[in-house]
A protein has these predicted regions:
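Conserved alpha-helix/loop element of class I SAM-dependent methyltransferases that forms part
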Residues: 20-39
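A short acidic, Gly/Pro-enriched loop at the edge of an enzyme's catalytic core
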Residues: 98-109
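A short SAM/SAH-binding and catalytic strip from SAM-dependent methyltransferases
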Residues: 107-120
Length: 175
């Protein structure tokens, strides 16, 4: 995996955001989706774990959270934060595409703010479809880098269909 200056700068920004308290409330965002104890969650493009840690607490010890990112430093930060907060149900995956997870093994996939950064969107969306359980859902959070209309345009070419929107969160199920 090659060094990416843009990703490194984003990592630094996220760390600073969390340390100086720029208004950002991942727990409130997570409450907008239906996550239950015991579920298996994939936080694809987890960054420093802003959503990973709260989700891991929600699914509890019977659940599991896979935190996937292409930046080793981001994953190291997730591991350190999890240890500090006593969260032991997070498994990190270093990858920029393939998850390595079994078919139909994930209840909920979080794709929060990272869709614009994914180079091969077709490959990644096929991979996410592969690992998602038949009754699971893909939750995409849109932001200033990619508007809702563009996400819907991309998703129209996939095997996912929009089932729900809550603020900036779009939830998709398998067709």
């Amino acid at each position: 995996m090659k060094f990416n200056v843009k990703s490194r700068l984003e990592y630094i920004f996220l760390r600073l955001r969390d340390r100086i308290g720029i208004p950002f409330k991942p727990v409130e965002e997570i409450k907008k989706i239906d996550i239950k104890q015991g579920q298996v969650i994939l936080d694809y493009g987890c960054g420093i774990g802003s959503y990973t840690i709260p989700v891991a607490k929600l699914v509890g010890e019977l659940g599991k959270v896979y935190a996937l990112d292409k930046q080793p430093l981001a994953l190291k930060n997730v591991e350190e934060r999890a240890e500090k907060e006593g969260v032991h149900n997070i498994h990190t995956i270093l990858s920029d595409g393939y998850t390595g997870l079994p078919d139909e093994s994930v209840d909920v996939i979080l794709l929060y703010g990272v869709l614009p950064e994914i180079e091969d969107k077709d490959f990644v969306l096929r991979e996410l479809y592969r690992v998602l359980k038949p009754d699971g859902y893909l939750s995409i959070r849109y932001c200033f880098r990619m508007k809702k209309d563009r996400i819907l345009e991309i998703m129209d070419t996939t095997k996912f269909s929009l089932v729900e929107q809550k603020d900036h969160i779009l939830n998709f199920k398998k067709k």
